[in-house]
Amino acid sequence: MAAKEVVFGGEARARMVEGVNILANAVKVTLGPKGRNVVIERSFGAPTVTKDGVSVAKEIELKDKLQNMGAQLVKEVASKTSDNAGDGTTTATVLAQAIVREGFKYVAAGINPMDLKRGIDKAVTALVAELKKASKPTTTSKEIAQVGSISANADETIGKLIADAMDKVGKEGVITVEDGKSLESELDVVEGMQFDRGYLSPYFINNPDKQAALLDNPFVLLFDKKISNIRDLLPTLEQVAKAGRPLLVIAEEVEGEALATLVVNTIRGILKVVAVKAPGFGDRRKAMLEDIAILTGGKVIAEEVGLTLEKVTLADLGQAKRIEVGKENTIIIDGAGAAGDIEARVKQVRVQIEEATSDYDREKLQERVAKLAGGVAVIKVGAATEVEMKEKKARVEDALHATRAAVEEGVVAGGGVAFLRARQAIGGTIKGDNADQDAGIKLVLKAIEAPLREIVNNAGGEASVVVNAVLAGKGNYGFNAANDTYGDMLELGILDPTKVTRTALQNAASVASLLLTTEAMVAEAPKDDAPAGGGGMPGMGGGMGGMGGMDM
């Protein structure tokens, strides 16, 4: 086992704080509307340019082991905030640095770190309660757009795209972000349920312009096994032909004679049929067939529930207003399923999401919820270069998370104002059990000025002047760093999701408390470099002599 270096007390904390400062100083330049960029080297290709705090934090790894531990703990603040709220990573880092810096002074002055931590926790709990009180629900499209714009570093087009997407697919719908093909970002909405399986034969196409098979008011047959014998299908086909409506067959596989007969019937115009493979694999396939059944008001024909193809009646078939089957996708629009059944199914899948352990499973389950809830919106991010595309895509994803957070818990005044107002609301009401806890409370109440100070510094202003001016105002009165003016933050559209603000403060305080209560650090000792090999391998000088006498 390699030798370890153990450092105690003040020295340990000092080295850790150095690491915290290095990471936080690199991250905090990105804060606010006038935040600067950070350029990150890549091992190959062009460097990445970003204004996203968590992207900067993730790249930082320090040579000094003890400094690195401090930096990694603060990195945890950024990534945890990003995971929980999707935004607010820079704010969280700035707060963590401020709490550590202030707290370090108190600990150095001999205050008990454990009581200091308890004081910090008390202050944070009180502030979070005030933030929740001040929170204002986000309902209108305009408010959603404002939140999206702020989170995307004051880019209004992104905010508007997200608001439009939420209008189209609802607050619960799935919104995905993809690389666009043009310079402009655009929104693409797929209504109804889409799954990634297309027609089994191009002969089913009935709309050559779209290269798709369009079925109006069709029946839907869902079968969980292969269909290769046409005799199995005949009873169903006869009933559907009598009803004079088209049919979509979704099965594990339709092959051989069965597929050939369906194609011939379609070409001759006797019956309008399209066959597609069932989406997914294994258990997921069963679940998706069940989803389609609930959406269309039909049943999955499966032997395990006592249904066979010969016994199928029209009542067992699903129905929809319209179905489009392309080469690779099938879209079911306006299924005839009962709203109550669909809602119950969505609830059921939501419970599975809560219990899912892997990210992949969670993502697939969320896709199923979206498909049932009615629609998927795709934001296609446009940019001139690959580098800009990556940077912009990261911002859109951030903004999307922030908007979801705003819809969930509402918004508070942005620009660091909410913290100051929460502090004013608390006034001197919270008291610790002793002087050391009071110090912890005082420390947090001072540290929460940090985000506003940093926004002002990045905008080239004088932080103390602005903080005093904001404190002199009331309510949502704050500083708009984009154009150096003061006003009502909510009216100016400078909003932060309550969840983001709250999570940033809680995570920052949690990690800062850990740092302040550290008394010893253990890291691998630096290796003593072996002397350079200048004089190695003596006695090699005179080798290979005596070769001269060889005749060539």
UniProtKB/Swiss-Prot annotation:
One of its GO terms (biological process) is protein refolding. It is an enzyme of class 5 (isomerase). One of its GO terms (cellular component) is cytoplasm. Pfam families: Cpn60_TCP1. InterPro entries: Chaperonin_Cpn60_CS, Cpn60/GroEL, Cpn60/GroEL/TCP-1, GroEL-like_apical_dom_sf, GROEL-like_equatorial_sf, TCP-1-like_intermed_sf. Its EC number is 5.6.1.7. GO terms for molecular function: ATP binding; ATP-dependent protein folding chaperone; isomerase activity; unfolded protein binding. It is found in: Cytoplasm. Its main location: cytoplasm. Keywords: ATP-binding, Chaperone, Cytoplasm, Isomerase, Nucleotide-binding. It catalyses: ATP + H2O + a folded polypeptide = ADP + phosphate + an unfolded polypeptide. ATP binds at residues 30-33, 51, 87-91, 415, 480-482, 496. CDD domains: GroEL (cd03344). Forms a cylinder of 14 subunits composed of two heptameric rings stacked back-to-back. Interacts with the co-chaperonin GroES. PANTHER family: 60 KDA HEAT SHOCK PROTEIN, MITOCHONDRIAL. Together with its co-chaperonin GroES, plays an essential role in assisting protein folding. The GroEL-GroES system forms a nano-cage that allows encapsulation of the non-native substrate proteins and provides a physical environment optimized to promote and accelerate protein folding. Belongs to the chaperonin (HSP60) family. This is Chaperonin GroEL. It comes from Verminephrobacter eiseniae (strain EF01-2). The lineage of its organism: Bacteria, Pseudomonadati, Pseudomonadota, Betaproteobacteria, Burkholderiales. The gene is groEL.
